[in-house]
Every structure is written in structure tokens, then in C-alpha cells.
Design a protein with these regions (language model features):
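Loop/turn elements at helix/coil->beta-strand transitions in domains of secreted/extracellular proteins
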Residues: 18, 92-97, 129-136, 162-167, ...
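Sec-exported extracytoplasmic/periplasmic mature domains
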Residues: 60-64, 118-125, 158-162, 172, ...
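The feature captures the short pre-catalytic strand/loop hairpin that immediately precedes
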Residues: 27-46, 200-206, 229-254
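Short acidic, glycine-rich surface-loop motifs adjacent to enzyme active sites
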Residues: 96, 103, 120-147, 170-171
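C-terminal subdomain of the subtilisin-like protease fold in secreted/lumenal serine endopeptidases
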Residues: 74-86, 133-137, 225, 265-274
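Hydrolase catalytic cores
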Residues: 56-59, 97-103, 229-274
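Active-site-adjacent substrate-recognition loops and nearby beta-strands
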Residues: 5, 68, 79-81, 113, ...
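Active-site core segment of subtilase-fold serine proteases
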Residues: 1-58, 62-82, 89-90, 127-132
Length: 274
């Protein structure tokens, strides 16, 4: 069914679901250069890639049993992970809103990030922010982030945080031989930058691909936290119940986003900074 999907339209009854909603800000042919974005209601991951699908599974995947079926049992009782082909995400009961800002031609422009962030603050554009996103996961970024280069984005991130949204982004994959490199938008004050950790024996250490900070030029203590980001198994696009293994800070970010969603559930009155 996935292989025959027409990404330019949403088939009746297929989307949105109780679990997943979203929007495509770019359209299939948008490259970020001379093309005009053609938004539509289907944020399906681009064919042959699967980055967004993998990230979504880490945040809120329900898990796949050995019988090849989505898990629909109790997550609070002790789970026997040996009975899973694909383990559940960090916050498996969370609802996902997939916002697609890249076309299928290339991933070389973040021109539509601001549009997506404004949507996160007010999804139905009615000037009532009560329906804002609780957590904004940004598994993207440029290699070198400079605070003063991104003033418009910084203001939006600050406003989202004031509204109560937790914004999480990757520190970047600039490797541990380079310091003073943190990817934008993780470089911003109000964004939680996540580094990538790997299991080394019985201890988690910073993964070789992960940026280590601090930020440039103000030497902010970034990243603020690390999370698993090497040899991470999650949902594989187009398979229904299959998995794939990816590396990168993009996979560390949803671990923190999922934890933030659980914190929001347990403490709905907490501010984003709390």
C-alpha cells in the first residue's frame, strides 16, 4: 500500500489517525532554491529515505510484537522486551504531528522551518495558543550554528518556550575532533541541544560523530544533554512493521523529546523550562 501511495493527496480515511496528524509545507518537488512550495495535507516521508519515520518511532512508536503486530497492551506493567521485534518508543501513548519541510528533491534548505514553528504555536491559526504542541522535535540542523545569524528563529523559539512548548534539537554530527561546533537551531538559548551517546561496554560515552560544543561565538554550555544515538533501531519506512538501524544526533533528539512528553503528561502545570 505504501509503494502505491500518491503523496500529492490524502486517501479518504487513511489520514489523519488517532495517533498521527500533520502537514506537508513543501510539496514533493520543492528543493528550497527556485521552486515554490506546494503545501498539502500528507506529510508522508520521502520515498527511499525514512528519516522522519525512524525519528517518529523513537518518540512514540507503539512497538511490534514477534507476531508482526502493533503492540496494544499495557506499558505500565513490566514488559518482556524479548517478545518484541521492535521495541516501543519513549512515549508510546503520545500523539504525533508530522511536519514536512523538505521536498523530495534535496534536503538542502531550511526555508520552511519558521512556517512549521509558527504552526506548532497555533495549529489552527485562531490566535488561541491552547492547542500548541507540547514538545517540538527538530531532528535537523546546519553543521555550524552561530547565535547572531539566526535572530528570527531565536525569537520564535523563545516565544514557543514562553507558551509552554519544549523545543529539542540535535547538537549536530560534527565529530569529537572539532570543538566550538553546535548545529543550529540547537545553538539557541531556548532550545535543548542533544548530543549523541553510544554504549561502550557498560558505560555510555559521547559518540564519535557527535558535536561536543560549546557553542560559538558565546561559548554556551551546549549540548545540555546526551542520549542514545548510535546503532538505534526504530521503524523502517514502507515496511509496515519492519525496523532499521540509524546513527546520529537526529536519533538522540527523539529520546529526549519522548522524555519531555512523559514529563508533560505527569506534570501538566510545569513550564517548558521546568
Amino acid at each position: 500500500a505504501y509503494q502505491t501511495n500518491d503523496a500529492t493527496k490524502v486517501e479518504e480515511g487513511s489520514f489523519p489517525t488517532d495517533k498521527v496528524d500533520g502537514w506537508d509545507f513543501a510539496g514533493k518537488d520543492y528543493s528550497g532554491e527556485d521552486d515554490v512550495p506546494l503545501p498539502d495535507g500528507d506529510p508522508l516521508d520521502r520515498s527511499g529515505y525514512g528519516h522522519g519515520t525512524h525519528v517518529a518511532g523513537i518518540v512514540a512508536g507503539v512497538g511490534v510484537t514477534k507476531k508482526g503486530r502493533p503492540y496494544d497492551g499495557d506499558y505500565f506493567a513490566g514488559l518482556d522486551y524479548s517478545e518484541f521485534l521492535l521495541g516501543p518508543g519513549v512515549a508510546p501513548k503520545a500523539k504525533l504531528f508530522a511536519l514536512k519541510i523538505f521536498g523530495d528533491k534535496a534536503l538542502n534548505s531550511t526555508n520552511l522551518v519558521l512556517d512549521a514553528l509558527e504552526w506548532c504555536a497555533d495549529p489552527n491559526a485562531d490566535n488561541d495558543f491552547a492547542d500548541r504542541m507540547d514538545v517540538v522535535n527538530l531532528s535537523l540542523g546546519s553543521t555550524l550554528g552561530l547565535e547572531e545569524k539566526h535572530e528570527a528563529e531565536a525569537e520564535v523559539f523563545t516565544n514557543l518556550t514562553r507558551l509552554g512548548s519544549v523545543v529539542v534539537s540535535g547538537a549536530g554530527n560534527s565529530n569529537n575532533n572539532n570543538f566550538y561546533l553546535v548545529a543550529a537551531p540547537g545553538v539557541e538559548h531556548s532550545v535543548i541541544a542533544v548530543g549523541s551517546a553510544k554504549l561502550d561496554g557498560t558505560v555510555y560515552r559521547m559518540a564519535a560523530h557527535s558535536a561536543r560544543g560549546p557553542s560559538s561565538p558565546y561559548s554556551l554550555l551546549k549540548p545540555e544533554i546526551t542520549a542514545p544515538g548510535e546503532l538505534i533501531q526504530s521503524a523502517r519506512m514502507g515496511t509496515g512493521t519492519g525496523g532499521a538501524w540509524f546513527n546520529g544526533t537526529s536519533l538522540a533528539v527523539p529520546h529526549v523529546s519522548g522524555a519531555a512528553a512523559l514529563a508533560k503528561q505527569a506534570h501538566p502545570g510545569w513550564s517548558a523550562t521546568e
